Amino acid sequence: KIICPGFIDPHLHPSMAAVLLPMEFVTAMRWKLPWGEVEPVTDPQGFDERMAALSTTGPANEPRFIWGYHQLWHGPMSRARIEAIASDKPTVVWHRSFHELYMNAAAMDMVGVVAAEIKPGMQIDIELGWFFEGGLGYAINRLNPWILAPDKYAAGLQRLKQVVHYGGHTTIGDLATGMFNFSAEAEALSQHLEGED
């Protein structure tokens, strides 16, 4: 009997994937996922139309997370642009690189962003609602109650498992466990990803 391993991905960041996969995808590329296909959105108008449609869904007291924005296709992003479309629906537009995100005022209020705490060099532009690189950490710490909510994070890990198997991978690795919350991530990763499947 010959056993051949599947693909190995040593740089997947399971926690990052578990956070992203439950989000609404609005991307310039087509995504074929086990639970459906996401058609590409390749211009600012299309992005705004999709954001407008998403802003009317879900509970009013829950932030809307949109992943996949990129300025080359979707144009410049800002707090004002989000507010012109999503109004007072708390909305987070996460860049496809994962290294930056934008929030409208409703989202910043909901998660407790305090303008007086923002100092020069923090890589945060409060007027644009833009949190990038180091400033992303500030935003993530405030978004954790939503992105790491046990049911949402567990659902993201289950989606990750589906995606990994869908792509023919049998082994994944991560060098960034703990980027959100080490103990919560380690426990959930062990519970949902360890095992025979």
Enumerate the language-model features and the residues they cover.
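Divalent metal-binding segments
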Residues: K1-E196
